[in-house]
């Protein structure tokens, strides 16, 4: 389909956002501040609506909906509101003597109209967190919530025009075909969160207009447990990260590498942690979510046959429930070890040396995050230094995403670009190079003719 056949609704919404940006209103610092304040008011006024929508879409527990979505967005909006003026200040840089008198600086300017394509697993957080970066940078935005989380998408479509500038921030809903039509439009930046297959389609569509992209994808994030680790605490934190949102977190630990001699201790501690979190029946726990839909449920259920189930394994298709599960003896070529799991199933793999564990991870695609547990600082330092990943967290999981000043992004197959906090402002800004020189003074050395004496003088500047 070429651009001439695109959905006219998409045309109108993108054109409205473009007109608002071209008018110049989004560059104004007061406008930016008001939009960020509007997001905070939206959350404060509709906290329960957000919780209900996330519950309908994902069976997300109330505590998760608040602490891992709504309140994180609120905190980031508040931090950006406090800081964007400082981030937006021009930065002076050294000007060579050959250009004296002159002044050089780097000026952040908004990229323009951004397309933000949200994800279904955290449909509130992963749609509005990048929007915060866009608003702080002074961009207009077209927001495309995930159609796979329809209750949250409907809520965003209802509330964003009420609390934000309804011309500069447009919400477009639709399925995959609608998203494809939207991608035919010209944007100044596209940010997509989701899987690698669609990420490639987004990048190909962006290439038609030479539009820069930020791709937040995923991958198989490893958790390496060193022999020096507190096994009980490592298991507890990994169990929390793997159970959060029923494992449907892009930075959740995908598999665990543990010393062969401590496998049983890890399994015992992991099972005990799950029992403390959710009791004897996770299906009855108010703090455990559900799988998004039947397609993902069936995909995850198939993984249960890729190894031997030693913890969990129960499923209920009628309620889209999969119990927190640990697999052992999963072959390296099994789908559960080749594909991002994105669910509460955890392969546990033994190793005989730390070198072997690191080599296992390095032989695979670069993950969105890497985790290491241990008291041996040198061993943990090696993982941070030698494993290329979007992020690293020592002795915990996932929490690096909650640090306001840390960027969130992948590397290699796990994505490109980053946002969150200052990184979000920078992502939606262009660093414009500026040189100002006086009208009257000029040495004339650069102008022809260039006899040898003049060249010798010029050489002294290089």
How would you describe each model-predicted region?
Residues 32, 77, 138, 169, ...:
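Residue-level signal for inorganic ion chemistry
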Residues 1-105:
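N-terminal Rossmann-like NAD(P)+-binding subdomain of aldehyde/semialdehyde dehydrogenases
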Residues 2, 27-28, 224, 322-462:
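Conserved C-terminal structural/oligomerization subdomain of aldehyde/semialdehyde dehydrogenase
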Residues 183-184, 217-219, 249-251, 284-285, ...:
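Short glycine-enriched loop/turn motifs at secondary-structure junctions
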Residues 96-233:
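Rossmann-like NAD(P) dinucleotide-binding subdomain of oxidoreductase/dehydrogenase enzymes
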Residues 10, 29, 47, 231, ...:
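Residues at or immediately preceding the N-termini of alpha-helices
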Residues 164, 197-331, 394, 454-456, ...:
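ALDH superfamily catalytic-core signature
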Residues 21, 25, 40-43, 47, ...:
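Structural signal for hydrophobic packing residues in well-ordered secondary-structure cores
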